[in-house]
Amino acid sequence: MLAMAKKNNKPKMVSLFSGCGGLDLGFERAGFEIVFANDFDKDAQAVYRLNIGEIDGRDIHTISETEIPDCDILTAGFPCQPFSNAGNRKGVHDSRGMLYKECIRIISEKMPKVVVFENVKGLLSTKYIDGRNLPDVIIDDLSNMNGVGYNVQHRLLNASDYGVPQNRQRVVFVGIRKDIAKEFIFPVEQPKDKLTLKYVLDIPSDVPNQVAWGLSPQQIEMIEYIPEGGSWKDVPYEHLAPRFKKIRDNMKKYHSPNFYRRFSRDEICGTITASAQPENCGIIHPTENRRYTIREVARIQTFPDSFLFIDDTQKNITAMYKVIGNAVPANLAYAVAKAIMEQIFRGE
């Protein structure tokens, strides 16, 4: 069994689909102790080990419930690509979309006091294979588990309401075991002080991971015409690639997409995605013709500067954008974790 040794009386946490550790970082900060973590992605594993600790790298289907230690709370950020607007939206028809059932299998055996699921907004409009809404399936699975079940609350949260300099909507489910007789109250929204990009991008030169993934010649040509706060709509027609000309010619048909958004220093950033492509996420620096560096993207996701990434090869540089884009912003995780700690575990 791969599990971290127990060190103290902190509430014990099992983390499934841990990614590079954004969610876990927030929960550790709130006072939880991670006793088991798992993720199948090797790039995410490497970053997790570098910063947080040991992580099981096996396919979750192959992990027996008996190999996972007992815990007070179980968290799971099961793969979001099947439900994401940035992905193909196959939902439960993508094999990854059914991975939450592996969480249910493990929860049913462990019955922790608290369960936390995190996923993208698209999950809310996803149908299960029997035609029911997937959120209803998740709630039913947890509510009726083992004759005890969980009181489940869920809410669509915008990370920018919880100290994250990014408009990033995520749905969070929190289930409290019914014998505890409490219902979770989500944390109140916080003031959006100092969340604009001008505060994020002021980085001392000695902070690590200040390397950027290069742009293609076509991308460079496009962004040279995009002013701070602008988008592809500012690019002269003659400098557009053929496929963008086709879209520009029929904006109504294509629902007026806003590609190549270049957020200004006085704005909160748009959603950072795993693909890190300027076409579909706010990845272009406000004043320089380049992608954000790894550190800049990490700051937008509220990873502290002490949290390290692996940038020794071009392959690893590209991979770091993926794992950061897939992560739960650490400050959002902390806000949820702190509320759980105060409502359920404080004073035990």
Which residue stretches match the model-derived regions?
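Short alpha-helix immediately C-terminal to the canonical SAM-binding loop
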Residues: 42-46
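Short phosphate-binding/catalytic loops that engage adenosine nucleotides
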Residues: 32, 53, 147-150
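Class I S-adenosyl-L-methionine
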Residues: 63-73, 83-259
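Phosphate-coordination loops involved in phosphoryl transfer and adenosine-cofactor binding
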Residues: 8-10
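Conserved SAM-binding motif I beta-strand of class I
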Residues: 34-39
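Conserved SAM-binding strand-loop segment of SAM-dependent methyltransferases
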Residues: 53-60
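C-terminal target-recognition/interaction regions appended to catalytic cores
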Residues: 222-348
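Conserved proline-anchored active-site loop of SAM-dependent methyltransferases
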Residues: 13-27, 60, 70-87, 114-120, ...
